[in-house]
């Protein structure tokens, strides 16, 4: 986000944490998504930009629009809950002997056919003595309803369960009133303040009514409801710093103080990543953190959110264990792979750059590979004319491996997939905007940076030996971000009191 300085970001984090800790045991305060400042990426900080960008009259007009949007969305959500209640599927009866619960994500339809979970892989089976002793609950981001997904899971005899979109009518109303009450409290506390401190509280008050905040509290009640049926010893979630993760931990502790909450830090940790590193009230903190590599383990140990023995390097499926001798730079390929993140604004930035480079370097090919959350068809339709005029630019629907094999350069911003590209011998180039905080996940490595076509031209004209040498150094450093999966390390959790 341009013109959002590090000083503003640090001030924002401090103020949001202060508001959270004023009611450190209140689930509705902890469930307010806007108070959990995840990291410095534009995807996350764009929601806070009006605090610093707008003067009073513009800011309050913005607040009014946010309030109106939240109320309309809330009304439509509750209307849907009411009319769909008679046809809602019955709750799944759970095996009381289940010892481990995993909360994961179904990001796209193709994930349904996977034999293993996208994030945890074989850990649910490895961690439990028997296959029937673990279950994976999915946050559903596919085009299928949870009811349809669960029929498919039963057909495949999988120990998977897609969480419903909503709870009962009564519970949904209870969530809304709880968040509304806390929103009024935050707004009341803002009356004696001025400037940006006041604006932060006013935005938090409005965002207490958002669907994201409702989702976090809903995850609390989902977890509580699950634990009414079974008494697991271990609960796993992905761990990025989102409010819903903390609410799952709190619900588990509410039902059983002895349950062990484990967060899996599966992605890279950014330079200014905040919510993942900061401690809240005990019941909202994980008991253990599994990291994806040595670098993540070191960063979290320094944060002191947990003792060192409770931060364990589990590894990641993102690293290729078969690549022992890293691939070297291949100058003869002349293809550039673009890796935008799962945000349409980020996709637009990368697509525009691809067309800009295409106009100046017509002999090269440009492959834009999108995140699973992005609709390729939607973007193909939008950029139909430009794609016809620039035949050397294509939006990929191939496998990642095929795209990597065809390319020798990779242009990225905040994606962690760049690590896999580096492993495969692609020369990394970070695309930055003027006057923005860096969102480079490889911020502590000497990576070439471009702002436009002129910068890119300088890189491709560099001596090939220099690029090969630099890539080797980058590859050596990058091995610390993602380690091969080590299930034995994860099992150490069972031996630590």
Predicted regions and their residues:
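Catalytic-core helical/loop segments in enzymes performing group transfer/polymerization on anionic/lipid-linked
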Residues: 1-497
């Amino acid at each position: 986000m341009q013109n959002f300085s590090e000083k503003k970001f640090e001030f924002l984090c401090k103020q949001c944490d202060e508001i959270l800790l004023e009611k450190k045991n209140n689930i509705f305060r902890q469930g307010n998504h806007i108070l959990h400042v995840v990291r410095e990426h534009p995807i996350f900080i764009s929601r806070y930009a009006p605090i610093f960008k707008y003067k009073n009259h513009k800011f309050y007009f913005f607040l009014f629009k946010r309030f109106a949007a939240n109320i309309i969305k809330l009304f439509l959500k509750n209307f849907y809950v009411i009319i769909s209640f008679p046809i809602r599927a019955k709750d799944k009866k759970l095996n009381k002997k289940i010892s481990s619960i995993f909360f994961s994500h179904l990001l796209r339809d193709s994930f349904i056919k996977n034999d293993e979970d996208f994030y945890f892989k074989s850990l649910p089976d490895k961690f439990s003595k028997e296959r029937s002793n673990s279950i994976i609950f999915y946050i559903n981001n596919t085009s299928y309803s949870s009811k349809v997904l669960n029929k498919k899971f039963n057909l495949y005899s999988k120990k998977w369960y897609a969480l419903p979109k909503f709870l009962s009518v009564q519970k949904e109303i209870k969530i809304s009133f709880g968040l509304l009450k806390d929103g009024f409290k935050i707004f009341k506390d803002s009356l004696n303040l001025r400037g940006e401190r006041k604006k932060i509280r006013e935005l938090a008050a409005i965002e207490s009514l958002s669907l994201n905040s409702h989702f976090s509290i809903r995850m609390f009640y989902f977890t509580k409801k699950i634990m009414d049926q079974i008494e697991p010893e271990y609960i796993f979630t992905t761990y990025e710093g989102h409010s819903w993760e903390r609410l799952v931990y709190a619900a588990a502790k509410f039902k059983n103080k002895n349950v062990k909450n484990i967060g899996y830090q599966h992605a890279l940790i950014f330079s200014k990543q905040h919510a993942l590193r900061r401690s809240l009230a005990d019941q909202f903190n994980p008991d253990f953190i599994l990291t994806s590599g040595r670098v993540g383990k070191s960063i979290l140990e320094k944060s002191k959110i947990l003792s060192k023995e409770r931060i364990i390097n589990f590894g990641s499926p993102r690293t290729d264990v078969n690549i022992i001798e890293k691939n070297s730079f291949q100058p003869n390929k002349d293809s550039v792979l673009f890796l935008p993140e799962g945000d349409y604004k980020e996709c637009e930035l990368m697509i525009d750059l691809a067309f800009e480079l295409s106009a100046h370097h017509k002999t090269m090919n440009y492959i834009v590979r999108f995140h699973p959350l992005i609709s390729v068809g939607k973007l193909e339709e939008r950029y139909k004319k430009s794609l016809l005029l620039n035949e050397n630019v294509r939006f990929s629907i191939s496998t990642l491996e095929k795209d990597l094999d065809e390319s020798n350069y990779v242009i990225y911003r905040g994606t962690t997939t760049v690590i896999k590209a580096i492993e495969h011998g692609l020369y990394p180039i970070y695309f930055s905007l003027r006057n923005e905080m860096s969102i480079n996940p490889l911020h502590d490595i000497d990576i070439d940076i471009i702002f436009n076509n002129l910068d890119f031209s300088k890189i491709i004209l560099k001596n090939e030996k220099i690029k090969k040498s630099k890539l080797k150094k980058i590859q050596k450093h990058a091995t610390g971000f993602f380690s091969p999966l080590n299930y034995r390390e994860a099992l150490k959790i069972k031996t630590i009191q």
